Every structure is written in C-alpha cells, then in structure tokens.
Amino acid sequence: IPKKTTVKDFLSDFVSLYGERKWGVSAYATNTRLIENYINPAIGDMQMQAVTTIVVDRFYKQLERTKPVECNGRKPRTEKLTPANIEKVIKLLRSAFKQAVRWEVIARNPFDFVTLPKVERKPRQIWTVEIIRKALDSCKDAKLFVAMNLAFACSLRVGEILGLTWDNVNISDEDIAKDNAYVYIDKELTRASKRAIETLGEKDIYYIFTPLMPNTSTRIILKKPKTDSSIRKVWLPKTLAYILREWKKSQDELKGFLGDEYQDFDLVVALPNGRP
C-alpha cells in the first residue's frame, strides 16, 4: 500500500486484505455500506496522512447532521444518523486506521482519541407469564404458535428458530420419557447481500436458498452462528416436545399432499410449500 494514498483507496485495500478474511457476510455488508454511504462521500478523497484529530472531530460533527441513506428499499426511521450508527462508523474507522498504523501507512491512529456517542440502551421489556399465556392462547397460526413456544420455552432468537431443522430435534418416545428431549442449535437463518456472498465465498454458509425473484440484491441463507458459544443443546419441556411432534405430523401430511410441489429443506418452521 503506498504511503501517499487516499482514505477511499486505503479502505478498498482494508476491505480486501482485512475484511474479507475477518468478517462474515453480515458484517461485510454492513461495513461496506457504511464506507460507501457515510465515509467515502465525506473524507474519501483526503490523503490518509491528512486525517488528523481535528479532521476526525469535524467528521464526527458532520455525521451528527447526516441524513440516513435508504437501505434495501427500507426508508430510514430517523431524520439524522442515530448515535448507534455513528458509533458503528467510528468503530469501523478506528479498526481501519489501526491497520494503517500496523501497515506503516500512518504513524498514529487519530480515531483513538474520539469519544464515542452516548448510546441509550433501552431495557428489554420482559413478558410476564400471564402475557405469554395470553399471546399463546390468542395465536391462531400453527406455525407461529410453534415459533412462539420455541422462543418462550427455549429462549431462542428468531434466526435460530427459523434455521432449526428436524435432524436437530430429538423428540422420540424414549427422549421424552427420560426428560431428554432437546434441540441442537448449530445454524441460523438470515438474509445476506448477494455481493457479500460472492466476495467472501460460502464461508460459514451451509445453504443459499434460490430466490423467487432472481434480480434481488439479497439471498436467504443458512449459516453458522456468529460465535461458537451460540452452538448449544437446549432441553425441551415435555409440553413443547409434544407440540413439536404434532407439528411434524401435520407438516408430513401436507408434504404428502403436495408431493413434488413441497420444497423439503427439513425446516421446522417453514411456509406451507416448505420454503423459509
């Protein structure tokens, strides 16, 4: 990397030399979007050596006045960038400039001296047993009922529920009788950008679902969880084990009825045609 290089050119090298090795598809999509939408338009043409602490402070001020860019067709919910998004931009640049120091492009990291914005972490609302019971009693959709039970009884996240496959569900008579019924969480379902998948290859991706509309910029994928600690065995209460058995039975009946029209991905929570 030349010592006299612009921020834009350096970040391009940073993404290809560092990001493609270290980031998963979600992080790659997020970080490249931050670079394209908020970093390059503001400081991309500057020389790396010209980015001093005062430049960083001015850039920070500019971010606070910046309008969010529409993402994947979704309109922004706020008029200005949120502190959480500004924090993401600054952390990304801090990481990039740290590599610039390591690669001897610059002598020191001007982003080390930035005070990150105060991000208000709203406490999660915890549902009471009564609210959970009411929600389950009022649920008329069998698929949603199964998903809600997995969320409440097993504390599974949405991606984990949608990525759960029957081969990881242990609900035999013997399992239930011995209080040994469980699900094994080793993957999650998420949506990733097509460009990120093409750039990174299928690292940590188990399956890419064929899109219904081929020209879309994203793909639904089954992937390895972000951290190894997320891979775990979760025990099932007997009531939920029986709910899952009934759901499997009805899913198999539908599969038999639809025949070849059913797209069998072995998903526990799937659309009537088997797709996620």
Residue ranges and their predicted role:
Residues 39, 56, 93-96, 104, ...:
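Conserved hydrophobic/aromatic pocket- or pore-lining residues that grip, position, or stack substrates
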Residues 115-116, 130-131, 164-253, 257-263:
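Conserved tyrosine-mediated DNA breakage-rejoining catalytic core shared by Y-recombinases
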Residues 41, 118-120, 225-230, 270:
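Short glycine-enriched loop/turn motifs at secondary-structure junctions
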Residues 11, 22-41, 56-57, 74, ...:
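Non-catalytic DNA-binding core/recognition domains of DNA-processing enzymes
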Residues 1-54, 247-264, 270, 274:
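N-terminal DNA-binding module of tyrosine recombinases/phage integrases
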Residues 51, 84, 88, 275-276:
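Short basic/aromatic active-site micro-motif
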Residues 49-64, 112-117:
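Short, conserved phosphate-binding/catalytic loop or strand-edge motifs used
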Residues 69-83, 87-89, 102, 106-166, ...:
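Basic, Lys/Arg- and aromatic-enriched nucleic-acid-binding interface segment
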